[in-house]
């Protein structure tokens, strides 16, 4: 089996942790900060951070439209927390005028930013995850949740009555941060998706 080259958008967030988790899951991983680097990867992880900031960094780095184009052409992507927000087709509470989070439109979901509350309301807990025998330890930090999932979207996990992990084809998104634990099953799932075996 080949080792896919999976990029991690390295504008903000847990870049190093995702790079390590991807390597441990069997991928060749690299940071992506420029368009040329985006062109080199077989798949992309969009890490957590602050969604309006990352949106505007994508604009400043002239990555927003090239990323939208690659996603539309079928680039597999995994978004964690902010990554889930950005991969969505619609964002509720997107921010103030001129500083909104900009949806990439890769997954047919509507997400609500900061749905679980502010930074002080962050928490972690064990949740069931479709296809995995044992629960996943999920770290939620100012996390979103899914308000609406389209017909082609599979809900993989729920918390507090809302979807917090979804998949649509080769797109995967979680409201939580698996890179902050030693459990590599979510990253392994994404690598398997990229390799066409999940």
Curated annotation (Swiss-Prot):
It catalyses: aldehydo-D-ribose 5-phosphate + D-glyceraldehyde 3-phosphate + L-glutamine = pyridoxal 5'-phosphate + L-glutamate + phosphate + 3 H2O + H(+); L-glutamine + H2O = L-glutamate + NH4(+). CDD domains: GATase1_PB. Transmembrane segments: none annotated. Catalyzes the hydrolysis of glutamine to glutamate and ammonia as part of the biosynthesis of pyridoxal 5'-phosphate. The resulting ammonia molecule is channeled to the active site of PdxS. L-glutamine binds at residues 49-51, 113, 141-142. The keyword Lyase applies. The active site is at residues 81, 177, 179. NCBIfam families: PLP_synth_Pdx2 (TIGR03800). GO terms for biological process: glutamine catabolic process; pyridoxal phosphate biosynthetic process; pyridoxine metabolic process. Pathway: Cofactor biosynthesis; pyridoxal 5'-phosphate biosynthesis. The gene is pdxT. This is Pyridoxal 5'-phosphate synthase subunit PdxT. The keyword Lyase applies. Its EC number is 4.3.3.6, 3.5.1.2. Pfam families: SNO (PF01174). InterPro entries: Class_I_gatase-like (IPR029062), PdxT/SNO (IPR002161), PdxT/SNO_CS (IPR021196). In the presence of PdxS, forms a dodecamer of heterodimers. Only shows activity in the heterodimer. GO terms for molecular function: glutaminase activity; pyridoxal 5'-phosphate synthase (glutamine hydrolysing) activity. Keywords: Glutamine amidotransferase, Hydrolase, Lyase, Pyridoxal phosphate. One of its GO terms (cellular component) is cytosol. Belongs to the glutaminase PdxT/SNO family.
